[in-house]
Amino acid sequence: FWLFTWGQAESVIANDWMPLSYLFALVALFLVPFRTLPSAGRTRFLQTLRRVSVGGIAEAQDGKFGDILLADVLTSYAKVGGDLFVALCMFITPGSSSTGRPDRSCGGTLIVPLILAVPSLIRFRQCVIEYLRVKRAPYKESTGWGGQHLANALKYSTAFPVIITAAMLRLADGEAAKAACYRAWLVAVLINSFYSFYWDVTKDWDLTLLTSQRES
């Protein structure tokens, strides 16, 4: 694309359809059942995506790890999803271009925050489902009473204040309101970042760097 446009601003804006055509082709590979391509993997992926998209999670023997992995991928790419929506919105908006300066209010002020929040909401619901499964099952010392799943759900819930305060900051009118929203956003970001860092190090990676088990 950059070789075709030579990096010239006018050409980049005029040919905004080129980078988006790749995205449409990628989606088509997943959705259109081409006979020349293997269908088993695509079918399995779409089934998992359908289950995960509503916050569902399979049993351990039915692919629970894959559901968690896909939901975590969606969480990691939440910002990318929001940016893609903005690009598509600007592409179909008359007088705008998807390769121009991003207009994050395109399509309304609530859609992008909702797109950012959905992946975290999916993982939050999955954690709650896992907690309820532990509560219904006979007690096992290896799984405990399910508190770890609630703590994991709390980790994903800390993303919501970040998204809400960021949206409020974008809509704030006046320096005082912007300063207050910025401080609230900064506190929310710090809580989310430190909680996520602690959880990843001690739980997901099983490191003792931040625990009392660390050897001196």
At which residue positions do the language-model features occur?
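Alpha-helical, bilayer-embedded segments
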Residues: 1-215
